[in-house]
Amino acid sequence: MKVGQLVVLVDEVDGLEAGREGCIMGVRDDMLTVGCQTSERLHLVLAHTWQVLPRELFRRLSAREGREL
């Protein structure tokens, strides 16, 4: 994963629900700083690498399971 990559949270992280899209703002070891926009403001959350998926992979997996995004 790299800075600027679009990702989707697959777990609830710091009060933001799973399925929320964000952009990687920073990477350090197995931790990511992810910026997620809500209607009120930009939330920066600290997530483990296993708590997010690249957006395109998430969409492909969701389509395979028959879910609409």
Can you say where each PLM-predicted feature lies in the sequence?
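Basic/aromatic-rich interaction segments and small domains that mediate binding to polyanionic partners
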Residues: 3-59, 63-66
